Amino acid sequence: MAGQAFRKFLPLFDRVLVERSAAETVTKGGIMLPEKSQGKVLQATVVAVGSGSKGKGGEIQPVSVKVGDKVLLPEYGGTKVVLDDKDYFLFRDGDILGKYVD
C-alpha cells in the first residue's frame, strides 16, 4: 500500500523523502504523555531519494543517504507531503544533519 505511493512520487534532484519516527507516547515507567509534552521527533527513515544535484563541473553528485537509512533531521524545515493519508517530509540532502549507523 505505502510502497505504491512511492512509485507515484519520486523526489527530484537532491531531495529526500522521509517518514518521521513516531513520538514516544508512554514513558519507560508507563506514564502516558499528553501530545503537548511529547518532544519534537527529529529521527526519520528515508523512503525515497532523488538522483542528486549537478556539481560545478556538470557531473551528478549523488544523494548521501539511501532508502532505509535512519537520519537526524533539523528541528525546523522540510516540506510536508501527504501520500496515502500518511504524512511524509521532503528535505534537501544538505539539510539532513546526519545518519545513524549500526
Swiss-Prot record:
Keywords, alphabetical: Acetylation, Chaperone, Mitochondrion, Phosphoprotein, Stress response
Domain of life according to the entry: Eukaryota
One Gene Ontology biological process: response to unfolded protein
Quaternary data: Homoheptamer arranged in a ring structure. 2 heptameric Hsp10 rings interact with a Hsp60 tetradecamer in the structure of a back-to-back double heptameric ring to form the symmetrical football complex.
Residues annotated with N6-malonyllysine modification: 40, 54, 56
Modification sites for N-acetylalanine: 2
Organism classification: Eukaryota, Metazoa, Chordata, Craniata, Vertebrata
InterPro entries documented for this protein: Chaperonin_GroES (IPR020818), Chaperonin_GroES_sf (IPR037124), Chaprnonin_Cpn10_CS (IPR018369), GroES-like_sf (IPR011032)
Gene Ontology molecular function terms on file: ATP binding; metal ion binding; protein folding chaperone; protein-folding chaperone binding; RNA binding; unfolded protein binding
Modification type N6-succinyllysine: residues: 28, 40, 54, 56, 66, 70, 80, 86
Cellular localisation: Mitochondrion matrix
Its biological purpose: Co-chaperonin implicated in mitochondrial protein import and macromolecular assembly. Together with Hsp60, facilitates the correct folding of imported proteins. May also prevent misfolding and promote the refolding and proper assembly of unfolded polypeptides generated under stress conditions in the mitochondrial matrix. The functional units of these chaperonins consist of heptameric rings of the large subunit Hsp60, which function as a back-to-back double ring.
UniProt induction comment: By stress.
Protein name: 10 kDa heat shock protein, mitochondrial
Phosphothreonine: modified positions: 79
CC per GO annotation: extracellular exosome; membrane; mitochondrial matrix; mitochondrion
CDD domains hit by this protein: cpn10 (cd00320)
PROSITE patterns per the UniProt record, alphabetical: CHAPERONINS_CPN10
